[in-house]
Design a protein with these regions (language model features):
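Active-site acidic short loop of glycosyltransferases
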Residues: 39-41, 134-135
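The alpha/beta-hydrolase serine catalytic core
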Residues: 64-166, 171-200
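Conserved alpha/beta-hydrolase
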Residues: 1-12
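C-terminal alpha-helix
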Residues: 33, 198-206
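Alpha/beta-hydrolase active-site loop
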Residues: 17-36
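Short beta-strand immediately N-terminal to the catalytic nucleophile in serine-hydrolase-like folds
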Residues: 45-47, 71
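Active-site signature of alpha/beta-hydrolase-fold catalytic machinery across serine-
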Residues: 57-61
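Gly/Ala-rich beta-loop-alpha elbow adjacent to hydrolase catalytic centers
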Residues: 47-51, 55
């Protein structure tokens, strides 16, 4: 089951509803619906970027998850999880956070972002949550992330490698960008195929 977070994709909610608490509630509702409708047993979360951060946090907050697949998660501790807003100057991210928390919201990247998101990001540490939940976890990053710092990637890789059933897969995605795409069509197709096959194989192993 796939879901769009508030203000994203097919969601009809305003982007100001894009907060970690709302996203957590949305995931819980989706899992409940899936289990009631399809009678599923074990449940895994697959998340990309901010979705990967939320997937990392969710088991600690709500439980009931068997495995995680994290595609390029934005797992920097606290506000470092928002580093993509200005990857070259983190002080600018801190200034945006202060403004948003003081005024209730700010406009950036063409959307209105709630101060609540910055506060909840500041108070969250997804890699600490991964260590605590210690679930089977697949982690992938590409060779050209761009909007995620080398530090965030290295710290997250180290955490997943330390887990009893952690698996880090990097090589098939060396030519991809943060969205696992490439301007070269053949490379893009290979990235898509590798991501799907790697994820499916991992989930089959731990959900069967």
């Amino acid at each position: 089951m796939r879901l769009d977070f508030p203000g994203c994709g097919n969601s009809t909610e305003p982007f100001t509803a894009y907060t970690l608490s709302n996203m957590t509630d949305d995931v819980e509702s989706a899992i409940t619906y899936m289990q009631q409708t399809y009678g599923t047993g074990r449940t895994a979360l697959v998340g990309h970027s901010m979705g990967g951060r939320l997937a990392s946090l969710y088991p600690q907050r709500r439980g009931g998850i068997t495995a995680l697949a994290l595609w390029s998660p934005a797992n920097g501790a606290g506000l470092r999880g928002m580093e993509f807003l200005n990857i070259d100057d983190f002080s600018a991210v801190e200034a945006l956070a202060a403004e948003a928390e003081a005024s209730g919201s700010i406009s950036t990247w063409g959307v209105d972002v709630s101060g609540t998101l910055f506060t909840e990001m500041r108070d969250s540490d997804p890699n600490a949550a991964l260590r605590e939940s210690a679930l089977p976890t697949l982690l992938t990053y590409t060779g050209h992330e761009g909007i995620l710092s080398d530090t965030t990637q290295a710290e997250t890789i180290a955490v997943v490698e330390s887990l009893p059933d952690g698996r880090v897969v990097l090589e098939p995605f060396a030519e991809g960008n943060h969205n696992y795409l490439s301007e070269d069509a053949a490379t893009a197709a290979a990235l898509d195929k590798a991501l799907r096959e790697t994820t499916v194989a991992f989930l089959v192993e731990y959900l069967k």
